Amino acid sequence: MKVIVTGAAGFIGSTLVRRLLKRGDTVIGIDNHNAYYDPAIKEARLARFATHPNYTHMRIDLADRTAMEEAFATHQPQRVVNLAAQAGVRYSIDNPLAYIDSNIVGFAHILEGCRHNGVEHLVYASSSSVYGANTAMPFSIHQNVDHPLSLYAASKKANELMAHTYSNLYNLPTTGLRFFTVYGPWGRPDMALFKFTKAILEGEPIQVFNYGKHRRDFTYIDDIVEGVIRVLDRPAPGNAEWNSDQPDPGTSKAPWRIYNIGNNSPVELMDYIAALENALGKTAEKVLLPLQAGDVPDTYANVDDLVEQFNYKPATSVEDGINRFVAWYLDYFKV
């Protein structure tokens, strides 16, 4: 199978590319290698598979319409996984326009590429952040997500709406995956686990927001990628029982679906930090701070639909996942 993966030098994208290549797929990776965080780790991720005979890499921006049209026309993919986006809830507060270019304009170019080139299935990264002001736990795809708390969250909700439009108008199968706090080896340096590990090893204090009372449904990278692959292999069907008088937000008569991919087991931030301290054999100096603008206190994924449709549920414990991350970190940075 020939697959375009956008964000191929990113955390989730690079891990997915390796899995697809390992099983024999042909992969065209797209990434703009921006400097949102240190590009060196992107290059290091890419180096693990850049010379694979079934891999082609393209350094282009999703917002570049001509380049994206050429990528689709040249390679004619059967499936597409969009993992490229301007990430970060907090960054979106100070840099909103970056999210429009990548997450809205760029996604429109992907949808157009799929539409005009006979793509069989588009899978794209949404986010748990779309649940916004909702506090009904666990978060279900059958709940409305109409109150985002950041432009990042709004852009991800917009992706879901744009995808539905294309599924409805052009019969393009699309599936959105709401990822819940992904962590693990080769992670993003701007995320808490990476920052905490660096600070603790250097004897620096760590900033703990919401006084450590956050609960997050931390989900290990390999569990995320396994979910992506299972979904990718089964193009989204329409829901024949969908009722327009009582519309279900998670399905449609069109070939459009949404799924949560989370560990279904939220962990308090202080417990997450304790697991990291145990893995490092060091105690963190903590600076307790209030909840930041745009953040939500808790996330908790209801994965019943994922289990029902794909017989799959993430299961890696925080302790095991953090131990694997720390082992990778110490080796990668030669600490």
What are these regions (language model features)?
Residues 158, 162, 166, 196, ...:
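Hydrophobic alpha-helix immediately C-terminal to the catalytic Tyr-X-X-X-Lys motif of short-chain
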Residues 66, 104-112, 190, 222-225, ...:
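Conserved active-site region of classical short-chain dehydrogenase/reductase
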Residues 40, 93, 173-176, 190, ...:
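Non-catalytic, surface-exposed connector residues within folded enzymatic/regulatory domains
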Residues 19, 200-335:
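C-terminal substrate-binding subdomain of Rossmann-fold SDR/epimerase-dehydratase oxidoreductases
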Residues 1-182, 312, 324, 328-332:
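N-terminal Rossmann-like NAD(P)+-binding domain of SDR-like oxidoreductases, especially those catalyzing
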Residues 137-138, 189-197:
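A glycine/serine/threonine-rich, flexible loop-to-helix segment
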